[in-house]
Amino acid sequence: MTRTVAVLVGSLRSQSINHTVAKALAKVAEGRLVFDFVEIGDLPLYNDDLWHDGRGPEPVERMRAQIAAADGVLLVTPEYNRTVPGVLVNALDWGSRPWGQSVWVNKPAGCCGAATGAIGTAAAQLALKAQMVTLGMVVMGHPEFYLKFDPEKFAEDGTVTDESLRGFLKTYTDALAAHIERLC
């Protein structure tokens, strides 16, 4: 059965390497997972005063509906100053409120990321995974995904040109699909 994954990328940059990686994962997962990319750049900074009658601003309600409708979640994070970008934390905050109405609870989830440095996004992912567990997501622990990004391994359309990398992405998406299937 094909499952839907809400994908949140923690970078707003138009040429984001993490968007490139997320699109490559989507291509590799075709037929097993459908990636529904969630726009988080238009979310206001979290402010409890913006809730009215249990509803948040329109971008918040759109994001929450996408996540609620998905079978699982994939957070694709860059690493800023050895931690998670504020835009991604902001999305997590909006999704966890109002109290008792979190869209994250019991959601099968994965976490991955890419950077140009040798350790990929290891520090950010450690922080993010702790937050994901705190929010009640059921986080896939293995395989881990810390990618040192090499632009020469991707075509302009996002297709992975390196066979070894394509295999790694397939292993990851196979594991994510199995994780979601077990929990749905």
Predicted regions and their residues:
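A generic structural motif
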Residues: 30-36, 137-138
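Helix-loop-strand module that forms the ligand-binding subsite of alpha/beta enzymes
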Residues: 55-136
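Glycine-rich phosphate/pyrophosphate-binding loop and the adjoining helix
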Residues: 138-184
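Short hydrophobic segments within beta-strands
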Residues: 8-10, 38, 112
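Short connector loops at secondary-structure junctions
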Residues: 36-45, 144-151
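N-terminal beta-loop-helix "entrance" segment that forms/cooperates
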Residues: 40-57, 154
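N-terminal beta1-alpha1 ligand-phosphate binding loop
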Residues: 2-32
